[in-house]
Amino acid sequence: DSAVSRGLGDVYKRQWIELEVAKAIKSGREYIEWTTPSGFVVRQRYYKKKVERIQLQLLGRCDLSVAVEDGKEVDINRHKAATAPNLIHSLDASLLHLAVRSFDEPIALIHDSVLSRCCDMDKLSAIIRETYMLLFAEHDYLKTFALYVGAETEPPIIGDLQPETVIESTYFFC
């Protein structure tokens, strides 16, 4: 039952983001922008694609629609679909960026995989946990995002997140 409640809470947060992003675009914004905790400015632009229809004749006839370039009209549906995952990915990237800056050993990052020497993993794991705790202990990123998009409604409550619990947890990130 609590897993279902948590899942519904996640859906509600995503729906809130979609609603506020749609309002921002409808009010005339051409892009959605926010700054991550590590200082990276995300500027999300989506435009409706210009589509050309072509007919192919090869072992029969085939009609295709091909996107050839971005148009000039903002694509509200792509913004709605992309903003929540992009916000989460930007927070993940910020966490990694800030953690890696504190890690003075050899490291490689490929997408969301972290590669380091085995002998350094305990140190890296501790740094990532501490960075996570510092990032999320006293800051509500949905409230900050609400300011960036000029939200008309309050963001949903994050819930009972206790970031300090990651310090002692068996599994976290790495």
Please provide the spans of the model-predicted regions.
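Single conserved hydrophobic/aromatic residue that forms the stacking wall/gate
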Residues: 1-12
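C-terminal structured domains
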Residues: 16-108, 115-174
